[in-house]
């Protein structure tokens, strides 16, 4: 069976959609309360300090933004968590395509990530672990771009710095 490049992207987007829907819908229907770390981030978000006794501020900042948009709807925080994860999957897919020069292997690399505990069962709880994933994925991706260039572009170096700072603040 031949799989064409357009089909790989379709399979990838189907996978992202299924992941987003399942990992948003199931906790929304089965959990009575938000996870404790998400509630903690909501409490911290009301202060918007530059750090807290347990964690850096990024997760509280982002949860506060979502609270201002969606209010106290629990499903929104499960959705927020999955947005961070599927965005990370998207960056890993792009990174894998560039490294491996093969879209099938790039898709397999993302599907293998789905098998890692931190990309599935723990993702409904928006906490610092979920918050930092896209920042570190982007830091690695742009670091690879910088190291792969004969003469690094200033723009790419600044982007690495911005995403690394986002990772540290997560």
Predicted regions and their residues:
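Alpha-helical transmembrane segments of multi-pass membrane proteins
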Residues: 82-86, 109, 129-143, 157-160
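Extracytoplasmic catalytic/substrate-binding loops of multi-pass membrane glycan-assembly enzymes
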Residues: 26-41, 50-65, 71-76
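Start-transfer (signal-anchor) and selected internal transmembrane alpha helices
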Residues: 1-23
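Short acidic/glycine- and proline-prone juxtamembrane loop motifs at membrane-interface regions
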Residues: 121-131
């Amino acid at each position: 069976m031949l799989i064409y490049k357009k089909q790989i992207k379709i399979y990838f987007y189907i996978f992202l959609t299924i992941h987003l829907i399942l990992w948003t819908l199931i906790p929304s229907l089965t959990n009575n309360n938000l996870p404790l770390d998400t509630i903690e981030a909501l409490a911290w978000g009301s202060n918007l300090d530059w750090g807290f006794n347990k964690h850096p501020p990024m997760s509280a900042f982002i949860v506060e933004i979502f609270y201002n948009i969606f209010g106290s709807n629990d499903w929104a925080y499960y959705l927020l968590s999955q947005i961070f994860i599927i965005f990370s999957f998207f960056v890993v897919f792009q990174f894998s395509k560039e490294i491996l020069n093969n879209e099938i292997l790039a898709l397999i690399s993302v599907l293998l990530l789905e098998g890692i505990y931190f990309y599935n069962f723990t993702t409904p709880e928006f906490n610092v672990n979920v918050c930092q994933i896209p920042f570190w994925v982007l830091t690695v991706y742009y670091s690879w771009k910088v190291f792969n260039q004969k003469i690094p572009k200033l723009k790419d170096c600044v982007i690495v710095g911005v995403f690394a700072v986002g990772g540290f603040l997560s």
